[in-house]
Amino acid sequence: MKKSDSSSSLVFSGIQIEINNNYGSGSGSNNNNNNNNNNNNINNNNNPNNNPNNNGPPLRPSSEWVLLSSSQPTIATTTNLTTNAPLSDSMIMNYVGNDNLNTPITPSTSSPYLKRNNSNLNSIIENSNNSSPSNAITRNNSFNMDPNNNNNNNNNNNNNNNNNNNNGEYMNSSIVFDNNVNNNNNNPNNNPNNNVHSNSHNTNNSITHSGSITSSNSNNNNSNNNNNNNSNNNNNINNSVNSVNSLMMNSDKNCNHQFPSDDVLISNEHDIIDLALNKEFLNQYRIQTNSIFINSQHVINQDVQSYQDYESLLSSYNTILNQLLLITSSNKNNNNNNNPNNNNNNVTSPNSLLSPPSTSQLQQQQQQQQQSPSPPLNNNNNNNNNNNNNNNNNNNNNNNNNNNNNNNNYYLMSTSTMSSTTTNLSTSTNSNINTNIPTNYNMSTSITATTTTTTATNTIAIGTTTTAAITTAATNSTNSNNLNLSSTNLGLDNNFLYQRILPEILSLLEKLTVFSRNNDTEIFNRLGNNVKLIFDHLNLIKNDILEANFSHLSGIFTIYNHTIISSDKTTKQFVFRFLHSLAPMTVPPAIVVTPELKKVVQKIHFSKPTFTPLCIEWKEICKYIDVLKSVSLFIAQVGQYCFLNQSIIINDELLFIPSIYVLFDNIQNLSMKEERFHIEYILHNLKFIVSKIPKQTREFTKTEIERLYSYIRGNPSYVKEILPKLLKNIYIDPYFYHLWNNHCIHLLNNNINNNNNNNTNNSSNNSNNNNNTNINIGKDIGNDLTLLLVSNKNSFLLSFDERHFSIFYSSISNSTTTTITPTITSPNNNSNRINNNNNNNNNNNNNNNNNNNINVNNNVNNNNVNNNNNNNNNNSNQYIVNYFDNTTSLLNFIESNQFKYIILSNKEVETIKFFKSVLPVTLPLPQPSSRQAILQQQQQQNYKPRILCGPCLSRFKTILDEFDNEESIENQIYSNYLNNINNNENIDPNLIDGNENKINGNDNNNNHDDDEKTNNNNNNNNNNNNNNNNNIYNNNNIEDYNNNNDNNYNFENEINDKENEFRELEKEINEIEKEEQELIKEYLELENRNQINLDIKQKLEDILKEIKLEEKTHYDLVNNYYQEYFDLKQEDEIYTNQINAIRDQLERVSQIDINKITFKIELPNTGVNGGIVGYNESSNTTISSINGFRLGTLSNLKVDWEEINSAWGETSLLLYVLASQLEFNFQNYKLIPMSSKSIIQSKNDKMSYTLYGGDNIQFSRSFLWFGASDQRFDSGMEAFLSCVNDIATFVQSKKPSINFNYRISKDKIGDSNRLLSIKIAGNSELNWTMALRFMLSNLKKILDNLDSIVESKQKQQQLQRQQSLNNL
């Protein structure tokens, strides 16, 4: 059979993403589902040519896990489950079946994984999808060569059990993971005395409100078998449920050890079995652990009191969720009662659902189920069984269908999840569509209980579990014994019940707030803060109740993928871990089968609050420089890219994701502007952030940029809601990141015009209406694609395989044609196949021929059946399969509007192989900074290992031993299988021919009659023929043996000779063995010597390493010494040069006479006899100066009094400095130099005299004429001259060698020839000026000899001191 690839998809709240993946192998047709031990039935579906799994050995047998503990009773084959969630028709045992290690996690679950049932090998429940051989003990001591022969039906006299399509277009079974609900075995052909459970692959099944599964094609058995199976189912179902609940509610907490957050999914997990199971997941999730989490993650050590408080809060939380779920389920149950075909006499009130049923009520219900056989609760073959003689019993049973177990659903509710919906879908009901489909109500964000006065909508669980939700007409039943609630009253009652729970929610919110404030602890697991999750979830529920909006959608996550049912355990582990890494703990994934697609596709649903924190371990992110906060835009002309002229640095790792949300929230308004460059700016921001994620993230392609442009232009909310979530997943989730980098995730060009949810059509009240009303959303798209294409406006599509889209669609029926073939794509050769498993239209074929491959002839027959069904007013959907190589062709077909319903499905794939090829062994981590390295080192130092108590250690060891034993058994089974294959290759061809003849004879006898009795007779005849053939074959073997004995007698002598030779050879062999033993001893001695030599060599090498290390240390010390020496020497030279430079400067400064520089006196030239050269008034040199100020005036050269006064101030300052340095005190006067206003004060009478004059002073022009003068000024000059005379006398006393040129007498000064007065009165300008010059000359004489005078004075003082000492 050709392997064909198909697609599965994943829709993530606002994000649709496509993922490419290679199919490892097509899903083989599981045709060999019935292995009748009594040989009364020959399975004609054993076609090795159509089964690719027969071409080679099976996969390695995987461990089989059951949810029941060893002390619980075994679950028998069941056909009816009292469950609150929809079950797949062919998967009843996966919660208790093998390969299923991924139980949905709820806070009340004792373990996130499943326990192993080791009590009885015969009770191991086998999965129909398990491709490994089963244990011989569980297979009635017969080794099954075909890995697909998983069902052993004893005493099965019916050949119409394997009505399975052999196309391989879809999986024949599906797995149901729906919180506390186990799967169901839908084949009622099992013997109740047989403990081996079989999973039939009947696809024409339906799902009822009670969660039971009925098989329409398997009801052709005798009544005894049916009754036994039904009673057996009713006896064992409650045991299964009680076992599940007891295991989930009672967890063994042997000690207070803690698990790292990346190992478990529940914070309060203490079951030691999880630690043992951890080795199963260690290798698979090391990649994710290395990418997101670090080994130094905090280990929370909580005290008992805080933990008890947390568990009490969690218990209250679960109680509220249970009550909400009961109210929601009451809506669903009352909708069942409103069904006109429902003859249920039970009266269920919404108020009665607030408490679980009592034990007596459960026992009564079980006894009622055991007293009468449980017929199929919902059979879709009311009018389609006219052409088959074997369906008479089935028609009789259809008249008594009821939902007796409907009221038993509510004690199997989910304790942690609740439903939320996207849209309300409605179509009119018909006889072929089960209108009583229960939905999986999982608590995630809000309550779904939307009802109207005319319709009671079965809303969709976990963000709409069914994409083709059928709206049932809310009409009053005609049965007088039923108490039905109208939809209006039901909505009001539920609203009242929701309001009653509101105070409990508010109270728990207050307790959660107090708990988070009072306890400085963090109850973290790998999915986030549980307390925070509960708080956010309850707030969402509270808001929904207050707003009376019970169908509000806060988030949806849907996976359309069949890899979950692969027998490859690692694939399922990967998929579930991938889901759990994205989902909160309180909203685990649940697998649900929709009513329209229950035989074709399965969907995994769980919803997620919008603002729920996901993975906690954040890594340091780069500095992001692009935030729009009141910043103007600068538009570049090249490339239409926009840049900011202001930036904000975000370097806090905890603010990266929030800052992205803030950024896109701020720039959302730009997308609503008409200019193109605004959207270009948004795209530039997106590309910039992706390029800065520290994982070398790939850039967007041109096609993706164009699609993003169209998305943003079409829907402005796309910027705020979708893009941040895409970046968040790339940044947080390692799988998402690597799939993105390897071009497995890219944008889907979804050009379908999406409308709001208000386009939902109400279904008709007439349940017999044959015209279905599809939901008009843009194009005419069926309900099965509604969730995929409408749940989120412009979104990404994530599919694990995109190589080929396998699409099933129902054509538009009209009066002329029944099938419209699309012209956009060219389908493969398999496109003309018809899905015979839908709508139960396989009744025209013989019992045995229904299991054959469908061909073109079957297509014609089935078309006839569809026409007949239309005449009988039965709406039978005909599904045609096409293959599309790319997404564009699929979307073109969708837009062509050539179908009524469309179904996306895919086959079993080995996804994990592709992921292993994509993901490296260890993901690269960004290099931590020095600060991060220090923090990580400190965290590692603070890390405390887990300490287990004695019971835990012993239990842990016991479980590991069990694992090892079972693994060895599985290895033995697998090796036996390989040995059997090798033995089969050596079988005598004659025996093979005989077996083929026997099988061919049986096949010929099974193809004659259509009547059931005739088939049974033929089967018996075939068995007799087989026995006869076996007897003849045995007789021939006896004759051949006698002939061989005659010949063997002649060769006895030769045999004796050979025996003698054999003995001699044995002796030689013994001798050789002795020699071999000696050689082995020698070899061992040499090995010992060699080992000793190696030890010596190793010691010498160690010594050599130590010597080299010491030598290296020595040379390092020497190098350091010389390095320090040369550094010090260089510093010494630098300091020496600095000292020399300072000394030179000091010498130059010391040679400078500060007094001469400060007081610069200029005198006119003098003659030989002391006279003045050019003694006339015209000579400018007559006037002396000090520091540039002239002291005196002439008749022909007038000097301003300001300059004269300044000169007098400098002169008084000079005299004051000389007296200070000579330590001389004037006897009569005190100098007060004040620049141009200097004065001199008498010490006797304290009179002050000025040393400055003014313009009022006039000199005498002749001897007889006196001028005007200032008496104080003249007295001051006379006093000043007296001071000069005193200091000159003091200098001569100290140093007699100094001779002054001019002598002073009272107010006159002069040489030996002439004395000139220093007063102005009666004096001329020339004489006054000359007198001042003489005075400055004497002062200059003292100034020039000041140093020698001081030195002479010091010497005299020393002599005096010496004399005084001598005198003493």
Swiss-Prot record:
Q: List the disulfide bonds.
A: none
Q: Which GO molecular function terms does the record list?
A: phosphatidylinositol 3-kinase binding; protein-macromolecule adaptor activity
Summarize what gene deletion causes: Impaired survival when exposed to pathogenic bacteria S.typhimurium associated with the accumulation of S.typhimuriumin in large vacuoles which fail to undergo autophagy.
**Compositional bias (Polar residues) at which positions?**
136-147, 168-177
Disordered as annotated region, ranges: 24-64, 122-249, 331-431, 819-874, 992-1048
Q: How does it sit in the membrane?
A: Peripheral membrane protein
Database matches in Pfam families: APG6
> Subcellular location, in the record's words?
Endosome membrane
Q: Which residues form a coiled coil?
A: 1047-1150
Which keywords belong to this entry?
A: Autophagy, Coiled coil, Endosome, Membrane, Protein transport, Transport
Cellular-component GO terms for this entry: endosome membrane; phagophore assembly site; phosphatidylinositol 3-kinase complex, class III, type I; phosphatidylinositol 3-kinase complex, class III, type II
Compositionally biased tracts (Low complexity)? 24-57, 122-135, 148-167, 179-246, 992-1005, 1015-1048
InterPro entries annotated for this entry?
Atg6/Beclin, Atg6/Beclin_C_sf, Atg6_BARA
Principal location listed in the UniProt entry: membrane
One record GO biological process:
late endosome to vacuole transport
What family is this? Belongs to the beclin family.
So what does this one do? Involved in autophagy. May be required to recruit the atg8-phosphatidylinositol conjugate and the atg12-atg5 conjugate to the pre-autophagosomal structure. Required for normal survival when exposed to pathogenic bacteria S.typhimurium by promoting autophagic degradation of intracellular S.typhimurium.
Q: Which PANTHER family match?
A: BECLIN 1, BECLIN-1-LIKE PROTEIN A
> What's this protein's name?
Beclin-1-like protein A
Record organism: Dictyostelium discoideum (Social amoeba)
What gene is this protein a product of? atg6A
